A protein has these predicted regions:
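Generic preference for hydrophobic/aromatic residues in regular secondary structure cores
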Residues: 5, 18, 68-69
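Short, charged, surface-exposed hinge/linker loops at domain edges
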Residues: 51-75
C-alpha cells in the first residue's frame, strides 16, 4: 500500500504525495481531520481512490511509529 506514496524533490518540494498526482499526503490527513469524509475527498479529487486514502493513513501511521521522541531531562 505504501508504494502508492511517492517522494520526489521535483514534485511538491519533496513532500509525500499520492503517486502520479500532486496530491500531498498532508492534504488528505488535514481534510480528514477537519471532518471531510472519504466520499468528500473522492468527489473533490477525482484522481484519488479509496486505496490512495488508505495509503496516506498507513504512511502517516508508519511515520509516527518510527518517530524518535526526545524527552527533556529532569533538572
Amino acid at each position: 500500500m505504501i508504494e502508492r506514496i511517492e517522494i520526489d524533490p521535483a514534485v511538491m518540494l519533496g513532500k509525500p504525495v499520492i503517486r502520479g498526482t500532486r496530491i500531498p499526503v498532508e492534504l488528505i490527513l488535514r481534510k480528514l481531520s477537519e471532518g471531510a469524509t472519504e466520499a468528500d475527498l473522492l468527489d473533490a479529487y477525482p484522481r484519488l481512490t479509496r486505496a490512495d486514502i488508505q495509503a496516506a493513513l498507513a504512511y502517516a501511521a508508519d511515520m509516527l511509529a518510527h518517530e524518535i521522541i526526545v524527552l527533556p531531562s529532569a533538572a
